[in-house]
């Protein structure tokens, strides 16, 4: 703690050259004025104060020494206990005032702003979820689900190859409804015999949320319209020969499809595609090294043949002598 100078002001004098009077009060009078603090900056008044004594201490008012009667007057000694109690009370009042002032200043301060860390979690996109589900289905991650899908699609295509679409749809709905209705009646019977709770065995699928929000419907509609418009524009450029090279490639592909159509119909082609989709991924996963080796050999042969053809076509004719 730093120290400051505390002074007791007695009287003003016109000059500092005059003698300093006695700091004790005159006879029969007691000085009850509190001890004051004097600023160290120059006083604006031309008069210079004189001081009886200098004390080095803290910023709080200091206690004065007990006042004694001047010698030769025969007065009794003045008791200093009441003055000390008064000065201690003044010190407590000053400390209380300072604490209240600091409390008011702290209340005026704004509370500290705690910046919370915001973690952004990437929302899974519907396209990625659909792609992951199809991949799991084709790689037989869930054997029962993959086997059920393959069997159902294969039987549906075989039925379509023999019957009309309306007949296949009607018989398929009858088969599904007969299975679900039988299971539901069975659970009701168990509940009547007090062997079950009678809950719907398909409650899990009934609780599944299949509704599309407005935003999802707009996204799907925009995606379908974009795909449709892109397909129409591509077919227009191919049929109207916007690029000669692309139109010739399209012509070759259509010509090869005529031979495929002569051997297979559309249902048979779809059936082969479905069987291949559920078969080739798992076979490739089991024999990946051998398949990659043969594929690299075929690609090298194809690149060599292509470079040979391009060299023959771009070879300039020999100059005649």
From Swiss-Prot:
Membrane topology of this protein: Multi-pass membrane protein
Keyword Magnesium: no
Gene3D superfamilies with a match to the protein in the record: 1.20.5.2480
Keyword Membrane: yes
Domain Reticulon: 134-321
Function, in words: Inhibits amyloid precursor protein processing, probably by blocking BACE1 activity. Enhances trafficking of the glutamate transporter SLC1A1/EAAC1 from the endoplasmic reticulum to the cell surface. Plays a role in the translocation of SLC2A4/GLUT4 from intracellular membranes to the cell membrane which facilitates the uptake of glucose into the cell.
Name of the molecule in the record: Reticulon-2
Gene that specifies this protein: rtn2
